[in-house]
Amino acid sequence: MADTKPLHQTRFEAAVSVIQSLPKNGSFQPSNEMMLKFYSFYKQATLGPCNTPRPGFWDPVGRYKWDAWNSLGDMSKEDAMIAYVDEMKKILETMPVTEKVEELLQVIGPFYEIVEDKKHGRGSGVTSELGSVLTSTPNGKAVNGKAESSDSGAESDEEQAATKEVREEDEEEESEHSEQEDKDVEQQPGHEKPAESIVNGLTRNHRELVTEEPTPLPSKCLSEPGDKVAIPDTHSPVNDPEADREEDCTEDIAAMQHLTSDSDSEIFCDSMEQFGQDEADHSLLLQDAMLNGDITETSAGGELKDGGEDGKQSGHGAQRKTWSEKSEHFGSRRERPSRMQPGGDGSRSGQIGSGGDGDRWGSDRGPNGSLNEQIAVVLMRLQEDMQNVLQRLHSLEVQTASQAQFLLRESNNQPMEKKPSRWPFGISPGTLALAVVWPFVVHWLMHVFLQKRRRKQT
């Protein structure tokens, strides 16, 4: 008959015998919660669902047992036996090895080895799934021309071929994208081709920013002896060679340095917000480079004057002051020291326009003027806010001082507190005297009443 028992019942009986054989004062003492679990599973496995009424309040232990048994609901006997054995497996390592425990281990079998096999199989499955994902992904990412992979040494020929195809596709997409951008720029009305040569330390990578200026630069600059770079003025109505030579602004190429931005080495942009931030950085670089190069441009007349004439009066000093202020501003904006070169002699420093007002350099053209106006507006608003804050602080200080004075006056105007009475009792003396005297008064009245009554009887 023992052979016909199911396996879960045999394991259940062995586990029950182990629990019943535990000594009361042994080394292993299960907790009350654990014993409640074993009790509920045992009752469910032997008697089925709980149908007995709940014990009364005088039996708290029975009530706890009944609650644990009733919480199992309609669990079947087989499930209760299996759950009982599972709970036994959790504490089997902490129990001392006895004959009953050895019998239970023989009935349960080597469950530790089965767990290890499951872990090993699960890890190999994850590895195989990861390998299949890596090999079956058609759209692999290529960052800076290098494909991402988990193990480059273990790639097969097919993976290498797929990676090569992905690289070629990405390169073709990039080239098509750049060509399409160039075509769109060329098709814009009233647009001229930007300068390809170095303009004040800016290379062709910044041609989009150069074209945003109202004065586009031609692709060809006149070169003069001494390594000079000429920047013609396109505002002049007549392209006269002599006027061009007078309007050219020469500058040493050795003094020019290539300006690099934080995003020169970044090819890919994560979002449009980053792209807009890069454009703002490039615009700041362009303005900073124009300040550092000491470039002087003509106004609508296109006339450049040397510092030997009118530059000594107002243009030279004011222009140096304005450039120093702007260079300090841009240096603080980009969190680096300004690289503006000090103004040289009169031949190197020119003035703008026929009026010779160097303070208006760039105020009516390009984003520089709007930037200065925005800065001025922000400073004015900040000053107003600071004044409001100071006024509020002053009003708070005045209110605090007035409140302190008011409290001081109130404390002075309060009458002097009465000295504590020396009477030891909590009641007044009159009340105490009345309480002591009234029994005698009542007794005297009763005595008088009784005497009158006796007289009447006699």
UniProtKB/Swiss-Prot annotation:
S-S bonds: none
Organism: Xenopus tropicalis (Western clawed frog)
Protein topology in the membrane: Single-pass membrane protein
PROSITE patterns in alphabetical order: ACB_1 (PS00880), ACB_2 (PS51228)
Family to which the UniProt record says this protein belongs: Belongs to the ATG37 family.
Stretches for region Disordered: 119-248, 296-369
Locations listed in the record: Peroxisome membrane
Transmembrane segments: 430-450
Designated name of the protein: Acyl-CoA-binding domain-containing protein 5
Residue ranges, compositional bias (Gly residues): 343-356
Composition skew (Basic and acidic residues), residue ranges: 177-195, 303-313, 322-338
Key word Coiled coil present: yes
